[in-house]
């Protein structure tokens, strides 16, 4: 009498995890294969959808522009840093002002800095 698929499935279903692990290793050795999962590429449009759903943004001061003093004041107000720390950020542009903020907050910060004469990027 031949063994059917159902018989094999029933026998495998009754094994413990350790016994299944041993069985898989035996198959790998006997047939020269690996039980590692094969990575399958997703649809091409999936990457674009992930980029649109970004929820956290970084606000980067690209340059201070001509109104450096005004930009320093806005940086101090946004970050809560002291005068020297805010000046160091403005002088060392491009620098990240805020990290991991919502889109609305990032746009608000961008408006404040641009009103003071700075060039800002949201990443």
From Swiss-Prot:
Annotated protein name in UniProt: Large ribosomal subunit protein bL12
Pfam families, A to Z: Ribosomal_L12 (PF00542), Ribosomal_L12_N (PF16320)
Species annotation: Neisseria gonorrhoeae (strain ATCC 700825 / FA 1090)
Similarity comment: Belongs to the bacterial ribosomal protein bL12 family.
Protein task: Forms part of the ribosomal stalk which helps the ribosome interact with GTP-bound translation factors. Is thus essential for accurate translation.
Complex formation: Homodimer. Part of the ribosomal stalk of the 50S ribosomal subunit. Forms a multimeric L10(L12)X complex, where L10 forms an elongated spine to which 2 to 4 L12 dimers bind in a sequential fashion. Binds GTP-bound translation factors.
GO terms for biological process, alphabetical: translation
Domain of life per record: Bacteria
Keyword annotations from UniProtKB, A to Z: Ribonucleoprotein, Ribosomal protein
Disulphide linkage map: none
Ribonucleoprotein recorded as keyword: yes
HAMAP family: Ribosomal_bL12
């Amino acid at each position: 009498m031949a063994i059917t698929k159902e018989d094999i499935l029933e026998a495998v279903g009754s094994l413990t995890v350790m016994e299944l692990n041993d069985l898989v290793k035996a198959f790998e050795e006997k047939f020269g294969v690996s039980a590692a999962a094969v990575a399958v590429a997703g649809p091409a449009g999936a990457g674009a959808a992930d980029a649109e759903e970004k929820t956290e943004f970084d606000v980067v001061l690209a340059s201070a522009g001509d109104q450096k003093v005004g930009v320093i004041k806005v940086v101090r107000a946004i970050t809560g840093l002291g005068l020297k720390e805010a000046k160091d950020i403005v002088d060392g542009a491009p620098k990240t002002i805020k990290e991991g903020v919502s889109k609305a907050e990032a746009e608000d910060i961008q408006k404040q800095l641009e009103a003071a004469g700075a060039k800002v990027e949201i990443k």
